[in-house]
């Protein structure tokens, strides 16, 4: 599916009232929103992932193929410049396709690395992270064998969790480059706010397990805070951890010296979670 065909289809699926409603909650300064609901975007993404997904991603400047090579920095920036003009729904579908395709771990992580700079809002971030079912230990079956092990994903995420720390940007097999990327302010809210959120939401989605919970707390204590969408992600992650590791989470929060704003958001999310549980148990 080429871009022109995709846009034509998205416009057919768009709902003006939904666009007006959604724009109140999803702030994206880079991309215009058409108003297509997520289930319809997922349906389109599945069609693309089952067909010529390489041609689709290449049309947006992604380096794809059997041996994925990251674009040079200048080419990467040119791609990001082009992608400033695409619709919000296009970015969503690009992320969904990357989540859905069945590719080796090195190819997957190289595509993710190229995708993350396009994230400039919580919706794209959270939908992409929630759909990353490729995270996990390899298992049986043609798709399970291409999962990316937790340890490999953990190391990969460090560059996003700590974008200002040089040692968190190692040369890795997945990207084929040792360059630390400089985005020149492509993200209107700051080039690292949504990179950090991406890292935190990935931790929340896949690393709240006994083997990693201690390391997750260490990261949440160190990660740079102060940006609204980072603080919200940290609070969300802690509230989710509270439901799984109650005593450990409470002990961490009590001694971590978290900013007052993060604590307030965390406490609100815990209260909201308790309310929802009570409602569910009363049905």
Q: Across the structure, where does each feature detected by a protein language model lie?
A:
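Alpha-helical scaffold domains
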Residues: 1-167, 173, 179-283
């Amino acid at each position: 599916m080429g871009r022109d065909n995709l846009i034509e289809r998205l416009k057919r699926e768009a709902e003006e009232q939904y666009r007006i409603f959604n724009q109140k909650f999803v702030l994206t300064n880079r991309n215009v929103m058409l108003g297509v609901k997520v289930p319809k975007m997922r349906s389109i993404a599945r069609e693309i992932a089952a067909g010529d997904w390489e041609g689709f991603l290449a049309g947006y400047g992604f380096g794809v193929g059997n041996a994925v090579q990251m674009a040079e920095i200048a080419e990467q920036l040119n791609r990001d410049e082009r992608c400033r003009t695409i619709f919000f729904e296009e970015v969503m579908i690009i992320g969904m396709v990357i989540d859905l395709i069945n590719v080796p771990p090195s190819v997957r992580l190289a595509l993710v690395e190229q995708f993350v700079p396009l994230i400039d809002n919580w919706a794209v971030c959270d939908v992409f992270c929630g759909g990353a079912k490729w995270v996990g230990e390899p298992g049986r079956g043609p798709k399970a064998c291409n999962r990316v092990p937790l340890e490999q994903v953990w190391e990969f995420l460090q560059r996003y969790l700590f974008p200002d720390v040089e040692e968190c940007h190692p040369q890795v097999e997945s990207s084929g480059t040792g360059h630390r990327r400089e985005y020149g302010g492509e993200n209107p809210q700051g080039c690292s706010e949504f990179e950090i959120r991406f890292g935190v939401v990935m931790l929340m989605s896949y690393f709240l397990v006994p083997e990693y919970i201690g390391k997750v707390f260490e990261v949440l204590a160190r990660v740079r805070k102060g940006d609204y969408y980072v603080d919200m992600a940290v609070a969300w992650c802690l509230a989710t951890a509270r439901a799984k590791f109650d005593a450990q989470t409470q002990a961490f929060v009590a001694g971590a010296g978290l900013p007052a704003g993060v604590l307030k958001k965390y406490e609100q999310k815990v209260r909201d979670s308790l309310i929802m549980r009570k409602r569910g148990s009363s049905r």
